Each structure stands twice: as structure tokens, then as C-alpha cells.
């Protein structure tokens, strides 16, 4: 066994200091999270090593209870290098313990201010990957701290607000109401009896700094435009992690995030949509976990409903068709659609409609009694009709679809008719098969889709721009869908 000399021990300490100097900011913050535990381990280890090195203290003898094992554990009392050998074993055990503490270290509420400060510095210096690697493992802690939902924060707040409160105060407003078990808050106690309990709050940390730091961190993550650009281009799945946070501001972030994704044909959203066209009979599409964004939003479509994901996709598409996003887009739409099958996976309008298709069918499969704002599609149809122009050079007006805009109208009507015919594919007894008593919009998907289809057909039939052959095709597609629901639908 090698001997650990004093010079060797000092050399090891110098190497550790040098390694710390070249660590990345992310690794340094990870070390700082466990410095207390590391210090508790390092102090006795250093004292023991120095004691064995300087004073040649013999190691403790092997306990007799171990019996025959002692001959393998004892270093040999006659050997003059025994103390140094034992010092080497202590140093080795210290190394193992230090590595374990570092790997097991987790941030705490106390470390959030430092974490936020470093993340802000990294973003300001445009070191976005380092900032994301620093923050991503701790998003849950950040979200909990910002809402004051950690156990220690809840304990402090319950003690501080224990007892009767003014019915008009904010404390009364935040107290849980309704059925279900709720923590006892002493509402019916006299104030003098509740006062000693409230005094206990002084001994429980409030962690206000952690709450403020976590809120600042979320503001940075949700509102930094440069960071959002980097997320969309390089780390799109970090955007999904942020979308999962049920905190104030997440809906606004998801809106900005999805807008950037649909506006960027090479983005992860287009890639996931292109790889998610396999239907899942009888309703909806397969949502493999590799498509992280679509799987998160639509495997449980309540996530899509909570985040109102139809709005950023629908609003961007309306602006695009109105000519407010890309001035050259209508030149493209009024061109020859000969290669549309190959082009559609990069076309924003088609992908927006396909996004709605996945969303609407997933909601129907899960029995969500909401139309998921499929009424965006008649607005798309109206804008497609207003920009429709088949008078360009090289356009065959007698073709089934003279232009790409004509093909998009056909695809749009196809999506609407497929949602109407969900009525036949829904299980018996589904509430989505119920029709409203009055002629209102209602919220069931098949009924809402029928209204949207009627609005779209009215736009098409009244158009003086759309070619007659295209109008006839869309009319026939609509009536065919009606006939599929009612055998006498064509009579």
C-alpha cells in the first residue's frame, strides 16, 4: 500500500484548488449547494490525516467482535508506515464520500437566490446552454417556491395566519373553501387562544428571498426574447419543460413559444407534426413520447385546454393569411400546387390545420366537452377566399385544384367533415353525441364542427373568386359527409 506523505497531501489539496478554478459556472453552483455537507466531511478528515501524518498516531485496534476478519483489516503494528497508510485510507474514504455528496446534492430554498443570480448572469452573457443546464433540473423547486407551496413555506404561512381573520382580508380570500379535507386554521378560536400559535411562525423560516428569487427566475425564463430564440432553435424540449409548470405566466410563455415554432418551418413542431400522422382507430392519432410537445399537449388534452394552445397557432395563421407576416406568402399560395404533397410538411397553414386536427380528435377521444376553438377554421377559409387568385400565368383553371390556396381549402373542408363524422365514431352514451336544445353554438365537437362546416361552405358558395370546379368539389365533399351520418342525407 502506498504511503501518503504530508507533501503528497498538500499536493492533493493544491490540485483540488486548481480543479475548482477551471470548473464551469454550472459545476461551481452545484458544489456550492453542498458546501455545508462537504465541510462537515472535510474538517474531521483533514484533522485526522494531519494527526496521523504529524504525530505518528497508531490507528485503533481491530474490535475483537470481528474475529478472523481482523487479520485482513489490521495494517501491522510493527510497520513504521502504518499511520501514513491509515491516513491514505482516510483520504480515500474522504474522496468517495465527497463524490457521493456532490452527486446527491440538491438545491434548497436557501440556494435559490444564488441560483437566480448566476442564471441571470449567464443569460446576460448569452451563455444560454449553460443557463438551461443550470436551471432545468430544478424547475419544480423554482415553481413550488414561487407559489409558496413548499412544505416549510406552507407551515410558516399557516402558523402566521392561524386563528380568526378579517373576512375582507387577503388571508381570508386565500383560505381553502369547498368540500374536501383542509388543514385546521383555528377559524373559530378566540384571538387570545390563537396568538401563541401565530408566535411560533417566528421560528419557522418564511423563505421570502427564495420566493422572490424563484419569481424573478420565472420572469427571466418566460420573457427573455433572446433566450426564447435559443430555446426554439436549439433546445425546444426545454420549452416543453417550462410549459409543464402550473404557474402564473406559463400560458403567456406557451403562446409566445408556439408562435415562434409555427413561424419557423424548420422547428421541432414541424418535425413532430410530420412524424405524427399515424391514426389511432377509431378516433385520433398516436402520440409517441418521442414527440414530446405533441405528447404533452394532447396525450392529456386538458393540458392543451389549460394553456389555450389554439390561440397562438390560430392567431399566427390568421395574420399570415391576412398578409401581416410574410409578404410573399400569397404569391406562393396562388401558384401551381403540383408538388403540394411534398411541400405541405413545411407549409404553415396546412400544419396549423393539422395541429388543430390532432387537438380536436384528442379532445373528442378523451370526452372533453369543449369545441377547442375549431371555429378558427372558418376564419381561415374566409381569408383564403379573400386572397384567392387563379389568374396568374401558368395556372390551369380547369384543374381540380388550380392553386395551392384551392388545395388548402379542400384540406380545410376535409378536416371539418372528419370532425363532423366523429358523431358516428364516438361510443354510445358519449355526451359529445348530445345536440343542444336551441340553435346555438354549443360546445360538443361534432355539433360545433357542423356549424363551422356550414359557415365555411357559405363562404365558398358565395365567392366570386374561387373557381367553379373547386366550389363543386367542396360542395360534394360536404354533402358526402352528411350522407355518411344520415342515410337519407342526400334526399
Feature annotation, model-predicted:
Residues 75-107:
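Alpha-helical membrane-embedded segments
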Amino acid at each position: 500500500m502506498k504511503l501518503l506523505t504530508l507533501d503528497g497531501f498538500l499536493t492533493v489539496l493544491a490540485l483540488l484548488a486548481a480543479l475548482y478554478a477551471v470548473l464551469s459556472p454550472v459545476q461551481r453552483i452545484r458544489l456550492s449547494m453542498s458546501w455545508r455537507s462537504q465541510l462537515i466531511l472535510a474538517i474531521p478528515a483533514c484533522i485526522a490525516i494531519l494527526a496521523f501524518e504529524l504525530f505518528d498516531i497508531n490507528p485503533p485496534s481491530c474490535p475483537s467482535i470481528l474475529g478472523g476478519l481482523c487479520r485482513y483489516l489490521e495494517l501491522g503494528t510493527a510497520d513504521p508506515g502504518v499511520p501514513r497508510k491509515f491516513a491514505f485510507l482516510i483520504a480515500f474514504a474522504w474522496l468517495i464520500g465527497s463524490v457521493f455528496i456532490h452527486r446527491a446534492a440538491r438545491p434548497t430554498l436557501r440556494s435559490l437566490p444564488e441560483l437566480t443570480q448566476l442564471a441571470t448572469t449567464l443569460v446576460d452573457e448569452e451563455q444560454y446552454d449553460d443557463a438551461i443546464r443550470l436551471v432545468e433540473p430544478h424547475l419544480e423547486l423554482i415553481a413550488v417556491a414561487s407559489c409558496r407551496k413548499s412544505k416549510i413555506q406552507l407551515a410558516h404561512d399557516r402558523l402566521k395566519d392561524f386563528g380568526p381573520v378579517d373576512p375582507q382580508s387577503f388571508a381570508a380570500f386565500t383560505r381553502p373553501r369547498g368540500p374536501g379535507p383542509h388543514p385546521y386554521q383555528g377559524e373559530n378560536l378566540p384571538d387570545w387562544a390563537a396568538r401563541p400559535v401565530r408566535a411560533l411562525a417566528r421560528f419557522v423560516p418564511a423563505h421570502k428571498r427564495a420566493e422572490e428569487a424563484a419569481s424573478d427566475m420565472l420572469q427571466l425564463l418566460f420573457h427573455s426574447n433572446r433566450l426564447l430564440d435559443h430555446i426554439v432553435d436549439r433546445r425546444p424540449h426545454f420549452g416543453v419543460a417550462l410549459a409543464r409548470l402550473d404557474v402564473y405566466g406559463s400560458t403567456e410563455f406557451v403562446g409566445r413559444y408556439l408562435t415562434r415554432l409555427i413561424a419557423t418551418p424548420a422547428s421541432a413542431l414541424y418535425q413532430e407534426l410530420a412524424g405524427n400522422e399515424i391514426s389511432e382507430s377509431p378516433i385520433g392519432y398516436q402520440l409517441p413520447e418521442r414527440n414530446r410537445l405533441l405528447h404533452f399537449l394532447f396525450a392529456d388534452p386538458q393540458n392543451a385546454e389549460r394553456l389555450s394552445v389554439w390561440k397562438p397557432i390560430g392567431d399566427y395563421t390568421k395574420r399570415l393569411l391576412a398578409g401581416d407576416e410574410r409578404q410573399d406568402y400569397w404569391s406562393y399560395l396562388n401558384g401551381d400546387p403540383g408538388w403540394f404533397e411534398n411541400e405541405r410538411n413545411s407549409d404553415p397553414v396546412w400544419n396549423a390545420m393539422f395541429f388543430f386536427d390532432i387537438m380536436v380528435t384528442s379532445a373528442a377521444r378523451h370526452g372533453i366537452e369543449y369545441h377547442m376553438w375549431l371555429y378558427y377554421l372558418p376564419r381561415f377559409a374566409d381569408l383564403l377566399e379573400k386572397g384567392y387568385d387563379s389568374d396568374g400565368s401558368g395556372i390551369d383553371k380547369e384543374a381540380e385544384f388550380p392553386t395551392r390556396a384551392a388545395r388548402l381549402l379542400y384540406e380545410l373542408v376535409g378536416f371539418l367533415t372528419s370532425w363532423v363524422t366523429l358523431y358516428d365514431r364516438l361510443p354510445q352514451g358519449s355526451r359529445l353525441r348530445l345536440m343542444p336544445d336551441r340553435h346555438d353554438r354549443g360546445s360538443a365537437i361534432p355539433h360545433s364542427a357542423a356549424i363551422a362546416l356550414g359557415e365555411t361552405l357559405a363562404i365558398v358558395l358565395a365567392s366570386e373568386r374561387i373557381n367553379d370546379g373547386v366550389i363543386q368539389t367542396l360542395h360534394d365533399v360536404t354533402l358526402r359527409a352528411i350522407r355518411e351520418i344520415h342515410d337519407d342525407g342526400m334526399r
